[in-house]
Structure formats: structure tokens, C-alpha cells
């Protein structure tokens, strides 16, 4: 080998000896165990006891004990309801048919000589029955079937619902509508009764009973039908009401509630518009604490100042409270004792409110505009800032208010746009409304004018053969056009979900500057606290909502202070408007319930609802709807989103009918479980049930993402490359959206390589060859928030009539 030559390195061949690696054995080493334990120390004492296997006889004995305990609990509940230790058994009679309304319904309930009837002079239709012989008492109320709100309020506090059926049809369309609302709210124990069977020939009674059984078995499985025509049949019905098992409603079992049987208003100011309202009734549910807030259904939250204990108006011992006649015998019919000086002498004050222990009525956080502001800089800092500004040129970009720093860095500069940065600030209040409207309006502007579409839709919906002068007088043409437009938008959203046409008269990067692209909707991160709206400074948020809920429920079970269940009390409610008393004077029921801690505060509530099958009108997001959530009623403009287990949830433009949807609104906190009913008010004042469900949670951090889809058409197709047009209309927009991933309807994925020309054509690369009939899509996302339109005032609905002018959405043609 020459001296200057370099020696080649040895390379091992294929037959090099391979030694076996070291094996640590079947067991892990101590270091591996320490790494897996991560500092955890083994328990020195066994925490869980070994399960002891019981013998067959012991297992049988244990099962018998559990069965006996459950039976005793049910019997104790039955015996406490309607006795001296509990409130009277509250029975609400509801007529499910117009012909089933009877004014003398409760004239049959008194069938024994010793029974006592009390007539309430303040609540229309309330009748109390006291039976000293069996030591039971009942309160019967005939509900007004034409007032849906009153009917639902009475059902919230009722122990038993007495449904009255028509012997011919069972229930009518309005009765079926009331049943849908009652089932969605939560149905307590119920009894079905029919009146008027005596007027039917004997030969036809068996057939009519079979027909009624077929009608009721769809709604009430294994329900027994009772007749209510004689006193003997009424006695059998009352026995069934007293002995049947009580059904519990979750939203009221953890709260104290009461139906006001007497009311008195004492003004506290010179105008007489605000004062102290005294409501008397029986405490139900849980103990009533005077330091808690109380909610009067339909009127708001208030403070209690005092709780009194007046004499029981329906005592089981008639010798104490019942007046005597001249002959010395008991009166069978009596009125409730009036509130006067004699009663006031017997009133005992149970408890008075402690101002230091009372809950606050504050429902919103008052944001501090100076919060987060820095202190005023020193002179040295000001000089340093001036020197820094002299050396650098100020870059001004046209961005919307609330855009984050890294989003603003992506926005390209436009010539002459630097001095117009405040143009978008003037339209800040209309951003959300205009943005949603423009998404749907761009596709309609290119097809033709709105007047031509309206004329064509009129010709389709009202043919010449069916026109009639009297019929046309009852048709609102403007309402018909608006409803048809909603049907078209909903149909378009189902066929082309989230697709939006790129505007030609506006720059796309300005039009969609609040949107962003995501690599993956499921896995890409999204900051929960980024660019929150100002309304989020007004709400309350829990660190752990379900942990707080568990703690509040546990405290409610352990507390033992307050008016006990079954006591007849008078509650003094402070700062109540006189309209509440006027409401009671008109014969409308007043229902009050105590609020749990934090339930007066505003937050973001999420409710899981499903579309009611009896309504198919299009319900667009952010439309004003009426909500019945537990004991509360309010109006709000909700967001609709998909129900999933991911951290981001896609918003829905319309209330879907084929799946469950999560509704998000600003509303006072309510701890679940609670039933939810969603109504939409018509132009004539009627309220239609559009969705039912339950309260999901209270979580302002739930991310609702709105998606828009920009579409383009492949112009020239190579192997894996294609020229796409009609997605953008200028070169700058193509460069701006270049980082966003593309997809096609046939499953291809790709990205933008470069723009071609100045008319928005772009060269794109895909993972496979495109088909000529395929469509190129681009997904853009932004987070959306509900509108703060919460209104606790809900107008009372007009008597409901079924809407026959419904349209099948699949038959609506899109222009």
C-alpha cells in the first residue's frame, strides 16, 4: 500500500456475530417500578374490607329487609300526604276536551255526613274536602284549560292530576297539545276519569269504553279509566287518588314550593306601586328558610322578610276551628275564615330574616371599565416610547374590533386602507346580524331580484282554483312571504350545509376576516378565553359546576331550619310590584319556590332539546323563543349546536328535527335536573311548542363554532394537480387563504400551490386525481356567542288553535 493512499474502513458483512441483548428477567427493576409509581407510596393498611360471602338464607333475609324498607317508605309517604302531619292532597282537574268541562264537577265529592267542604273566596275553583273519619284532606282545583301558563304552573305543584275525558273522542287537538306540554314538563301522579256515561245507551257503553281504552293506551300505558257520574263513583275515584303511588318530579323535590291560597298586599311607598306581599299556603317539597330567596313564577326573584304561622284553615279536628250552628251541630259547608283582627291575634311569628345571612339579589357582575389597565407611565418610559416610534414606522391594518394579535399579523396590507381603520368600528353593533344575513343573501342576489321570487312563490302557494275573497282576508301576505323564505333557507341548509358564495363586490379576506382555518376540527386547539365578548364580564362562572351542585344538594339535605313541610304559613315578601297582586285578583294562580344558592345569578345555560314532532316550522338560530326551565319562564335568543363529547361543537343554523340539539342562552343559573319546554310565539299571540328536553349544564366555556364552506370548480385537471376557479376572484385572496387545507365532496384533500393570473384562479395539489363533476371546498371557522336578550317577562298566550297552514320542507323548491 502506498504511503499516500488512505486505508479503507472495515465494514461488517452479513455473517457478523450478533450477540443476544441483556435480559433483565421477567420482573421489572426497581428503577422501572419507581418511574411507574411517580412518587406514590403503597398503602400500609388495607382500605377495602374483604367481601364476605353470605349464605343463601342470609341473602334471602337481606333482600326481604330491603323490600320491607322500600315498602315502608312508600307507605309513610302516602300516610303523610293529606294527613295532619302533611299538606292537603292537591288535586288539579284538567279537562282534555271542550265538552268535558263541568262546572259542578266537585259536587259529587261529599258523600259522607261527617265530611266538610271549604270554599276559597280568593281562588276561583278551589274546594277543600276534609274527612275526619279517615283523617284525610284534599284540595281540588278546576284548572282553566284555555290558559296554558296557569295550567302548567298548577301542574308544577300538584300531587295528582285528574284528567277529564269526553266519552266520544277522549281528547281534542288542544287537549293533546296540553298533554304534550305536561309530559315534557314532568307528569306527577294522575287519574283518568270520564263523565257523561249515564247519558249513553247501555248497549253502546261497552263499545265506547273499548274505543276510549284504545285512545288512552298510546299516551297512558296500563292506565285505568274511572267513571265520575255518581257519588259512589266519586268515592272510588278519591280512594284511588289517596292510595296510588306518588310520582316524584326531580326539579321540585330539592326545593321548597307553595301554592298561594290567600294574598294580601301592603304598599310601602307613597305611589303604592311597590309593597310587601303576604302569601299564605302549605309548605311542600323541602323546609322553607326565610333567609333564602324566593321566586314567584312569572314575576321574578324577591327577598323574604318574615314567616308567620296562622291557624290552619282546613283542620282535621272540626271541633276546634269549625263554627257551631244554633242547634249545636257542625256545619257541612263553610267558607274560609277571613283575615281580620281575630285571626291576627292567633298568628305566631315563626322566624324573621337575618340581613347578614340573606342571599343577595345581585344577578349580574358589574364590570369595572378600568380593570386590567396599567398605571400611568413615567417620563423616562414616555421618552423611550417616543424614541422607539421615531425609528419605526407605524403599521396600520384594517381589522375588526376584537381581532387578536396573531390574527392581525396574518392580514395583508391594502393600499390606502391605513387611514380607514375606524370604518368597521361604526358598524360594530351590526356585525353579527349583518354577517349571518349576508351568508344567506349572496346566493340570492345573483339569481334575480327579491320581488320576482316573491311573485313566483305566491303563484305556487295559492293557486287560482282555491282562491276565495273571504279566505284571502285572513291571509297575511307579508307573513306568508317571510315564512316561505325561511323554508327556502332551511331547505338550502339541508341540501348544501354551511356553503356560502364568495362575494364578488367585496374582498374575501375582509369579508371573512373573523374566520380561521383548522387542520382538524376535532383535534386542533382553540383557546377558551380568546376574544370573549363584553357580555361575558357580566356573568358568573363556576370553577367546577357539578362539584358545586353536589355540595349545594348535600347542604340542602343536611339543613333542618325553616318552616317544616305541611305547615300552613304566611310568607312576607319584600319589594313586590302591585302587578303581582293584580295577577292574583284576576283568578290566576301564584306559585312560589325557594331558590338554591347562586340560582339568581346570570350565566350561560346549555339545554339539550329535541324538536317536537307536532311542529315543523323553520326555527332559525338567534330567533326569540320562550323557555320554561323548571320553575322559571323567560324569553331569549338562543344558539343551536350539535351534541357531542368533543371540546368544540359545530353550530346549527336551524333547529334540526332529526336529532337532539344543544340550546345555549344567557339565563339565571338553575341546577339540573330540570325540564325544558321551548315555545315560539305567533303573530296572533299563540305559542307553539317547538322543542322539549332537559337542562344539560351551566358552562360559559362551551365552544360553539360556526362553519362556512367556500366552494370552487375544477377548471383544468391534471394527474394530482388542478386549476380551481370561482372560489376567489382576485390574486390577493388566494395568497391570504393559501395556508388553509382544501377538500372535495368526493373525499380528496389538498392545498393551494400558487395563484394563477389576477382573476382568482389557483393551482391546487390533491392526494389523488379529481373528477370533473367534483367540487372543491374550503372550511372556515369562528366562535359564536348567544345574544343578551334575556327577558323575564313572558306574555300570557292566546288560546291555542292548531295551525293547519304547514308546509313539508321536502316539497319546497329552491330557486
Curated annotation (Swiss-Prot):
Basic residues bias: start-end ranges: 19-30
GO molecular function: GTP binding; GTPase activity; U3 snoRNA binding
One record GO biological process: maturation of SSU-rRNA from tricistronic rRNA transcript (SSU-rRNA, 5.8S rRNA, LSU-rRNA)
Classification via InterPro entries: AARP2CN, Bms1/Tsr1, BMS1_TSR1_C, G_Bms1/Tsr1_dom
Residue ranges annotated for the Bms1-type G domain, each copy included: 87-247
Keyword terms, alphabetized: Nucleus, Ribosome biogenesis
Major location (coarse): nucleus
Superkingdom, natural source: Eukaryota
Cellular component, GO, one term: nucleolus
Location of the region described as Disordered in the Swiss-Prot/TrEMBL record: 1-51, 320-342, 408-482
Protein's cellular compartments: Nucleus, Nucleolus
Compositionally skewed regions (Acidic residues) per UniProt: 412-458
Function: Required during maturation of the 40S ribosomal subunit in the nucleolus.
PANTHER family cross-referenced by the UniProt entry: PRE-RRNA-PROCESSING PROTEIN TSR1 HOMOLOG, RIBOSOME BIOGENESIS PROTEIN
Family per similarity comment: Belongs to the TRAFAC class translation factor GTPase superfamily. Bms1-like GTPase family. TSR1 subfamily.
Protein name per UniProt: Pre-rRNA-processing protein TSR1 homolog
Organism: Xenopus laevis (African clawed frog)
Amino acid at each position: 500500500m502506498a504511503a499516500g493512499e488512505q486505508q479503507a474502513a472495515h465494514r461488517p458483512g452479513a455473517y457478523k456475530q450478533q450477540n443476544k441483548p441483556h435480559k433483565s428477567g421477567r420482573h421489572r427493576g426497581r428503577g422501572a417500578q419507581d418511574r411507574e409509581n411517580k412518587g406514590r407510596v403503597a398503602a400500609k393498611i388495607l382500605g377495602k374490607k374483604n367481601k364476605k360471602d353470605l349464605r343463601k338464607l342470609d341473602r334471602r333475609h337481606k333482600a326481604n329487609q330491603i323490600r320491607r324498607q322500600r315498602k315502608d317508605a312508600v307507605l309513610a309517604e302516602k300516610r303523610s300526604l293529606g294527613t295532619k302531619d302533611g299538606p292537603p292532597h292537591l288535586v288539579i282537574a284538567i279537562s282534555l276536551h271542550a265538552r268535558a268541562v263541568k262546572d259542578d264537577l266537585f259536587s259529587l265529592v261529599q258523600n259522607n255526613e261527617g265530611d266538610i267542604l271549604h270554599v276559597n273566596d280568593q281562588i276561583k275553583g278551589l274546594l277543600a274536602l276534609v274527612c275526619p273519619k279517615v283523617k284525610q284532606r284534599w284540595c281540588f282545583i278546576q284548572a282553566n284549560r284555555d290558559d296554558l301558563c296557569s295550567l302548567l304552573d298548577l301542574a308544577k305543584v300538584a300531587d295528582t292530576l285528574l284528567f277529564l275525558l269526553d266519552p266520544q273522542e277522549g281528547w281534542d287537538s288542544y287537549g293533546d297539545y296540553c298533554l304534550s306540554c305536561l309530559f315534557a314538563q314532568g307528569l306527577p301522579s294522575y287519574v283518568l276519569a270520564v263523565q257523561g256515561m249515564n247519558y249513553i245507551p247501555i248497549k253502546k257503553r261497552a263499545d265506547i269504553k273499548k274505543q276510549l281504552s284504545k285512545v288512552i293506551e298510546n299516551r297512558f300505558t296500563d292506565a285505568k279509566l274511572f267513571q265520575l257520574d255518581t257519588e259512589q263513583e266519586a268515592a272510588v275515584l278519591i280512594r284511588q287518588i289517596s292510595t296510588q303511588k306518588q310520582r316524584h318530579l326531580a326539579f321540585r323535590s330539592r326545593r321548597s314550593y307553595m301554592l298561594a291560597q290567600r294574598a294580601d298586599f301592603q304598599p310601602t311607598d307613597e305611589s303604592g306601586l311597590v309593597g310587601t306581599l303576604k302569601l299564605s299556603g302549605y309548605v311542600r317539597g323541602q323546609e322553607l328558610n326565610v333567609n333564602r330567596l324566593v321566586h314567584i313564577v312569572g314575576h321574578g326573584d324577591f327577598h323574604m322578610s318574615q314567616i308567620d304561622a296562622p291557624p290552619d284553615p282546613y283542620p282535621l279536628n272540626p271541633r276546634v276551628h269549625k263554627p257551631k250552628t244554633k242547634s249545636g251541630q257542625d256545619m257541612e259547608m263553610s267558607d274560609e275564615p277571613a283575615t281580620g283582627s281575630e285571626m291576627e291575634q292567633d298568628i305566631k311569628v315563626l322566624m324573621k330574616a337575618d340581613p347578614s345571612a340573606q342571599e343577595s339579589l345581585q344577578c349580574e357582575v358589574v364590570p369595572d371599565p378600568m380593570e386590567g389597565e396599567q398605571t400611568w407611565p413615567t417620563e423616562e418610559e414616555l421618552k423611550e416610547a417616543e424614541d422607539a416610534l421615531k425609528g419605526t414606522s407605524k403599521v396600520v391594518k384594517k381589522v375588526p374590533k376584537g381581532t387578536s394579535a396573531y390574527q392581525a399579523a396574518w392580514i395583508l396590507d391594502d393600499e390606502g386602507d391605513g387611514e380607514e381603520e375606524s370604518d368597521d368600528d361604526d358598524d360594530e353593533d351590526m356585525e353579527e346580524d349583518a354577517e349571518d344575513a349576508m351568508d344567506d343573501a349572496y346566493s340570492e342576489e345573483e339569481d334575480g331580484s327579491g320581488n320576482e321570487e316573491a311573485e313566483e312563490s305566491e303563484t305556487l302557494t295559492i293557486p287560482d282554483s282555491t282562491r276565495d275573497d273571504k279566505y284571502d282576508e285572513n291571509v297575511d301576505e307579508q307573513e306568508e312571504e317571510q315564512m316561505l323564505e325561511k323554508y327556502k333557507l332551511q331547505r338550502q341548509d339541508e341540501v348544501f350545509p354551511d356553503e356560502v358564495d364568495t362575494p364578488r363586490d367585496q374582498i374575501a379576506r375582509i369579508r371573512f376576516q373573523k374566520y380561521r382555518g383548522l387542520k382538524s376540527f376535532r383535534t386542533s386547539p382553540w383557546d377558551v378565553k380568546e376574544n370573549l365578548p363584553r357580555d361575558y364580564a357580566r356573568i358568573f362562572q363556576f370553577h367546577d359546576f357539578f362539584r358545586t351542585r353536589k355540595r349545594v344538594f348535600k347542604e340542602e339535605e343536611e339543613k333542618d331550619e325553616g318552616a317544616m313541610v305541611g305547615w300552613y304559613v304566611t310568607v312576607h315578601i319584600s319589594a313586590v310590584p302591585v302587578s303581582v297582586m293584580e295577577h292574583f285578583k284576576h283568578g290566576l294562580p301564584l306559585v312560589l319556590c325557594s331558590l338554591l344558592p347562586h340560582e339568581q345569578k346570570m350565566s350561560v345555560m346549555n339545554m339539550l332539546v329535541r324538536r317536537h314532532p307536532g311542529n315543523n316550522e323553520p326555527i332559525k338560530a338567534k330567533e326569540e323563543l320562550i323557555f320554561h326551565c323548571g320553575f322559571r319562564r323567560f324569553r331569549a335568543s338562543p344558539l343551536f349546536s350539535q351534541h357531542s363529547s368533543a371540546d368544540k361543537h359545530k353550530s346549527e343554523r336551524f333547529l334540526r328535527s332529526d336529532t337532539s340539539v344543544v340550546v345555549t342562552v344567557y339565563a339565571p343559573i338553575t341546577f339540573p335536573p330540570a325540564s325544558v319546554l321551548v315555545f315560539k310565539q305567533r303573530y296572533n299571540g299563540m305559542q307553539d311548542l317547538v322543542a322539549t328536553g332537559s337542562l344539560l349544564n351551566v358552562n360559559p366555556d362551551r365552544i360553539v363554532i360556526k362553519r362556512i364552506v367556500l366552494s370552487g370548480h375544477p377548471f383544468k385537471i391534471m394527474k394530482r394537480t388542478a386549476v380551481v376557479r370561482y372560489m376567489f376572484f382576485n390574486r390577493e385572496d388566494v395568497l391570504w387563504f393559501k395556508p388553509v387545507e382544501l377538500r372535495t365532496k368526493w373525499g380528496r384533500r389538498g392545498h393551494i400551490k400558487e395563484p394563477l393570473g389576477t382573476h382568482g384562479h389557483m393551482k391546487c395539489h390533491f392526494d389523488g386525481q379529481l373528477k370533473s363533476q367534483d367540487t372543491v371546498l374550503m372550511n372556515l371557522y369562528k366562535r359564536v356567542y348567544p345574544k343578551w336578550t334575556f327577558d323575564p317577562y313572558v306574555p300570557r298566550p292566546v288560546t291555542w288553535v292548531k295551525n293547519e297552514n304547514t308546509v313539508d320542507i321536502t316539497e319546497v323548491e329552491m330557486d
